[in-house]
Amino acid sequence: MAAPLAQQLEELLNPRPDLRDPEDDAEEATVAKVIDRFEDETADDVLPVGNIRKKASVSLLEADQRYSGKATSRKALQEELWGDALSEEGSAEEALDEWYSGSEDSEDNGSSGSKTEEQPSSAGSDQEDNLEDDEERDSSAKAPKFSFQNITDFEKFAEGMDDVGSSDGEDEDDASMEEGSDDEKYEGENHDHVKDTNDNEDDGGVMTFSKGQTSDEVEKGKAVKNQLALWDQILEGRIKMQKALVIVNRLPQPDTFPLFRKEGGQEFDSAVESCCKAVDTLLRVLVDIQDELLYQCPGTRHLVDGKQSKPESDDEIPSSSDEERAGEAQEKRKRPPKRKLKAEDIPEFIAKRYSDYRTYRNHILQKWHEKTKLASGKMAKGFGAFERSILTQIDHILMDKERLLRRTQTKRSVYRVLGKEEQDSHPVPEHLPENSEVLPQADSNRHLKDIDEEIFDDDDFYHQLLRELIERKTTSLDPNDQVAMGRQWLAIQKLRSKIKKKVDRKASKGRKIRYHVHSKLVSFMAPIDHCTMNDDARTELYRSLFGRMMQSEGPERGWHPGPPAPAGSAPYTL
């Protein structure tokens, strides 16, 4: 509503500025207001109970039933605690009313008579003292003092002590009863919840699951450990047979064998016969080892005993009946059947065994190739479509049979075949021409071009096996092996440095001195010189100083003087 015109003119003519109170907000929505409390609200709001107190109350209830409470009212509590004192309260109030009425009558009578006027002032003071004493008695009667003498039933007192002082007046009896019932219900629910939790913990379901998982992992670890131990033993046998293979490659070949037999006589024939028996025995031992390994595996047992095995699923989870039958068969016959093979039948037997084993081999290779491929994450790369399966790669390599045979017939190590003349080696020139800047390299790979059809040399594959064995032995991470852990840490740091190099941007333009820290002396050993120049290059450098070149020592081996020194130059010596 707009103000009157006179008030508006007065405000315009008034030179005093209008200072409004920021608290006076004209808007009704944003003006500050005082909200009255509701009638059912109390000053003492019920605060939430913490988890510690809840657990403590539950433990007390489980320990002793005397701590269990019950819903009651303040009036009933007072009657239980001090019933006699409350019954005497009414009589005390009646006596106090009679005393007040009697004192008023005595005052009226004293004012009208002459006897009251003659009383001394001390009588008035005595009456006042008596009045104060009566008031004290009245207050004590209204609020009787608490004493253990008035309490006869201490169990009821202990049960009701928790509810004393929970409310302030007798008007809140109903509210206190409702709150008591709610608290009792909440405590009951909490108690049931705690019991359920304890029951779940006592069941031991999680403990049993973790033990099962641990036992499975332990069994897998033991199986892998046994496989590695078996592989090490096979490699050890392969290393021992390598010596025999090298000796066999040095034996006389068919073109020179009759000459050796003629010259050797009976002693040569007996040595050849004993050698053939040893080779035959070795072949039979290898066949027995192969049968033993194939017979222990359920997937390849049919290759030994001839019984067709059932097709296995991808998950390879044998049933209990299969395990029982396998256990019974293992108990009845723990070893594969013995074979009686002649020496001339062994090559055919090995070829047939390889053709039968190839199906199982391809299945295992394909399965583990897919598992490792998924685990390594190679499927997610962009060029995954161009990758071929492991079986396709093997077939592609085996297609070139001539190349594979030529690699096994290549002489890779240095040894001399008996009865065969060695080829003359190309001499390496001792002196170099004057204008030659590149030193000739020795023909170190010349023996790789020497192909002999009568030998079998697989040194490249043998060296690869040895390299893998040494790497696995040296990089086996033992928790107690600090050296291996240090090597692994250095390898990881090296890979990290390759990924992201740390560049000091403030070290450019000569703002930081560049230096290399010399390594510490180990057992008083001189530091190793990491210079790229060898001794021959240094010698050639020192000899070519000051325009002179000395190719040999002494005048008899030839001196090649350089150009004459300029006049006035200082003499020099080498």
From Swiss-Prot:
Entry's localization field: Nucleus, Nucleolus
Keyword annotations of the record: Nucleus
One Pfam family named in its UniProt record: AATF-Che1
GO cellular component, as recorded: nucleolus
Region (Disordered): 82-205, 302-340, 553-574
Compositional bias per record (Acidic residues), positions renumbered to this chain: 86-97, 126-137, 168-186
Keyword Nucleus: yes
Bias (Basic and acidic residues) ranges: 187-198, 302-312, 322-331
Keyword match Cytoplasm: no
Spans traversing the lipid bilayer: none
Function of the molecule: Part of the small subunit (SSU) processome, first precursor of the small eukaryotic ribosomal subunit. During the assembly of the SSU processome in the nucleolus, many ribosome biogenesis factors, an RNA chaperone and ribosomal proteins associate with the nascent pre-rRNA and work in concert to generate RNA folding, modifications, rearrangements and cleavage as well as targeted degradation of pre-ribosomal RNA by the RNA exosome. May function as a general inhibitor of the histone deacetylase HDAC1.
Entry's family note: Belongs to the AATF family.
Quaternary state and interactors: Part of the small subunit (SSU) processome, composed of more than 70 proteins and the RNA chaperone small nucleolar RNA (snoRNA) U3.
The protein, known as: Protein AATF
Species in which this protein is naturally found: Gallus gallus
